[in-house]
Amino acid sequence: MRPLKLEVKGFTVYKKPQVIDFTPLKFFVIQGKTGAGKTSIIDAITYALYGKVPRYGASVATKYVLSRGEKELKVALDFSLRGRNYRVERYYREFPEDSQVRVYEEGRRLNIKANEVEKWLFKISGLDYKTFTKVILLPQGEFDRFLKESSERKKILINLLGLEELEKVRQLASETFKNLEGKREALKKEYELLKDYTPTKKEVLEKTLKNLEEELKELKETEEKLRQELKKAEEKDSLERELSQVVTKLKELENLEKEVEKLREKLEFSRKVAPYVPIAKRIEEIDKKLTELKVRKNKLTKELAVLKDELSFAQEELNRIEAEKEKFKEEKEREKELEHRLKKLQEIKEILKELSQLSSSLKEKEREYEQAKQEFEDLSERVEKGKKLVAETEEKLEKIKELFSEEEYTSLKMKERLLVELQRKLKELKEKEGQLENLTQKYKEKKKVHEKVLNELKELERELKERELHYHAHMVASYLSPGDTCPVCGGIYRGKALENVDAEGISELKHAKELKEKEEREIDTTLKLYAQKINSLKEEMEKLRNEVEELRKEIPENLKERIKKLEELRIEKEKLEHKLNKYRKALEDRQKQKEEAQAKLHKAQTELELLKEKIREKSRLVKEFKELYRVERLEDYEESLKEEINYINSKLQEIEEKEKKLRKHFEELSSRKSKLEGELSALNESINSLEEERKEKLKELANIYEVAKSPREVVELYLGDKEAELERKIKEFEESFQSLKLKKSEIEEKLKEYEGIRELSDIKGEYESVKTQLEEKHKKLGEVKRELEHLGERLKRKEELQKEISELEKKLEVYRVISNDFRGDRFQKYVSEIMLQKVVDRASEYFYKFTGNYFFELERATKGRDKDIVVVESSTSQRRPVSSLSGGETFLASLSFAFAVSDLLSGSANLESLFIDEGFGSLDQDMRERVSEILEAIKTNVNKMIGIVSHIPDFAERFTERIVVEKKGDYSEVRVIY
């Protein structure tokens, strides 16, 4: 695994977006002052991959790494692994809280949930969170002590490799030993139940199976022969049935031969008359047209005769009307005088209408006058009553004011507010009692959940211990070779095989344990919060009770009755005041109405006198008209005038209308007569032309007189488009007849090939019998196979049980050794000695690459003294202590051991990157001179990306590749130099 690019925003000191490109870097330094955020770069890499940061704990809440004052966080890491590129992005928002994870492979997003990322990383890299955090950042200072302090060497190695948990392994081994013993006994009991399933029984069944298969083979051969014979018989039967059908059809066609002959004759006639059909059709068209024209001619001749009579009558009528019109012109002079009288009469009628309206208006004015007079008298009386009512109301109001005190009412209302406050506090007290009961119930329920979670956590810890025990047992065995002496128990290791260890399962269990621990902490926090809330509620309730007592002391006993009495008086007072204002206003309104009524009465009297004078003048004009024309009733006189005028006008109009209609009718008749005469002339010409054409066509038809005697018969004999259909039917008949005769001969010839074939029914019966036998044999064969398969499974299970029991006994031997012999710290010492040798050997390879002359060896242990590390010069084989190394050599030696531990921890994880926390202080003169040479040696001999975290400027400046972290107030920025 090699980082390619890191993007951060809102992460610890990196508030603003920062991008670190690792691709041009190989051996570099992360440079910056203390607190600038150097280690935060490695924290960001770890957080991007696993969502956790080691220094804040494995199950850290993201809010601890969120930059101060920021609401959102983003960390993204691009890395390569085994030739493929990956990207992991993590997003977090504080409110509303939300977190997301996205994973990409070669630019394509993978469907991986947040809780599946660590499992996916372990699958592709072989590194779980715990291992990754040990190998990503190595404490250089520890390796410096590792070299120089032999007494602390094993302790440091145990800490680096995580061997401090091996005592837990021993305890788990003891528990697992008991569990495995129980499992072995159960397997032995199951093995005992399978004792009757033997190989001999299997051989008997296999022999039976073989016999059945041979019998089946013979039956199948017989079946195949019968099937072939049955096929021949079915073919013969099919041919015989087909021959019968062909013979039947031939007879049917022979019966149709006479009808087909008639069709041939009909077709021949049609072909003979075909050239004359257009002539015959034209003759028929001429006959039809002549008939129509002659009918039309007769009709028009009759119409022309009638039309001539009508014209003569119309001329006579016109002459009579002209004479009558001349005579009636004298009456028009008298009409003018009549119209003058009628106009005068209309004027008199209008005057009479006006008189009628004036009479109605007079009555209305008289009524209005009486109403105005009555209204004035009523209002005068009501004004007097209003004055009396105002005086009575004022007297009542004065009496109420004497009983009601505004100051007392205000004081009591203030006390009433205290009563409302008392009721509010009593209600609040009741609500808090309900809240207390609810919280107490929730606390009890959450307590039960807490106990359940604690039990689940204990079960997870037990299972995790058992898995780790198995894992470490496997690790112990991996360091021993067959024939080695166990340094703990002294026994000989015989190379007993162990099953593969599911490291991924351990990682998942640890993750589940961490989640359960987090859940337990959250529940515990909730319980404490509930307890705080309960105590707080109790304090608030006590305070409320005291306040209630104080309020009760301040409120008088009969407060409500006293307020009620005063409230009634106040309401009565307000009502009387409202009435008084109302009465006063009403009195003012009535006085105004009285004045208006008096003015209205005077106006009505004046209008009444004027109206009477106008009526007298109009009546005089009507009387003068009647005397002039001696008229008794105006309606009768008007009617006689109108009748006389209407008679004169209508008579003259009638004469003119008749004249107009007759002239129009005469013109129409004349026009129609001309048209009829022209049409008759054209009809005569058409009839003559058609008769000539008919004679010519009949002469042409004389050539086929022996076939058809008339044009109609020619048309009927001609088939037209039906000729082709008739010809096709005749041809189909002839072809079918010949085809059936040929087919009959072919079938008769084929049937000769099937002579000697048995009857179909006999063969079918024999075939069905053989098939039944085959089915029975197949059924029997299946039963034997199933029995044999079951026996095979049982025998296989016996073998599996033998193998499982054997493997369990091997495991039991290992756990027995661990639980009984690896006591105290002997196991840790033993493993640490093995690992020390491996670390020294691996570091020696690196040191020789860096120096070209030196390597490490472990001295032999002496009584009371641990093995020590010495430096050996390859050219002279001279040995010297590591304390004799110069500053630059010590730096290279520490790096060698750092790389060695990283290799051992990462195993097959292909870790292509490493970060080292340098632990030297300021460089001495020798180191300053040699640092460039050292860095070049590391670049040349290590195929890894290596970063050293340093806060010492003179050390960092020696690197050509640098990541510089600079503090900018409350945030930091990063620059990459290469």
Curated annotation (Swiss-Prot):
GO function term, MF aspect, one? metal ion binding
Which InterPro entries does this UniProt record tie to the protein? Answer: P-loop_NTPase, Rad50/SbcC_AAA, SbcC_gammaproteobac_type, Zn_hook_RAD50
* UniProt record, GO biological process: DNA repair; double-strand break repair
Example of a GO cellular component annotation carried by this entry: DNA repair complex
- Quote the cofactor binding remark: Binds 1 zinc ion per homodimer.
User: What cofactor is needed?
Assistant: Zn(2+)
Please give the start and end residues of each transmembrane region: none
Residues at which ATP binds = 32-39
> Coiled coil: which residue ranges?
160-421, 440-478, 510-542, 578-826
Which Pfam families does the record associate with it?
AAA_23, SbcC_Walker_B
For this protein, the record's PROSITE patterns field holds: ZN_HOOK
Keywords, alphabetical: ATP-binding, Coiled coil, DNA damage, DNA repair, Hydrolase, Metal-binding, Nucleotide-binding, Zinc
Question: Per UniProt, where does Zn(2+) bind?
Answer: 486, 489
The cysteines joined by S-S bonds are none
Record-annotated Zinc-hook domain positions = 440-542
Q: What is known of its domains?
A: The two conserved Cys that bind zinc constitute the zinc-hook, which separates the large intramolecular coiled coil regions. The 2 Cys residues coordinate one molecule of zinc with the help of the 2 Cys residues of the zinc-hook of another Rad50 molecule, thereby forming a V-shaped homodimer.
NCBIfam families for the chain: sbcc (TIGR00618)
Q: Which family does it belong to?
A: Belongs to the SMC family. RAD50 subfamily.
| Oligomer status and interactors | Homodimer. Forms a complex with Mre11.
Summarizing the function annotation, the protein's role is: Involved in DNA double-strand break repair (DSBR). The Rad50/Mre11 complex possesses single-strand endonuclease activity and ATP-dependent double-strand-specific 3'-5' exonuclease activity. Rad50 provides an ATP-dependent control of Mre11 by unwinding and/or repositioning DNA ends into the Mre11 active site.
PANTHER family reported in the protein's UniProt record: ABC TRANSPORTER ABCH.3
What is this protein's record name? Probable DNA double-strand break repair Rad50 ATPase
Q: Which organism is it from?
A: Aquifex aeolicus (strain VF5)
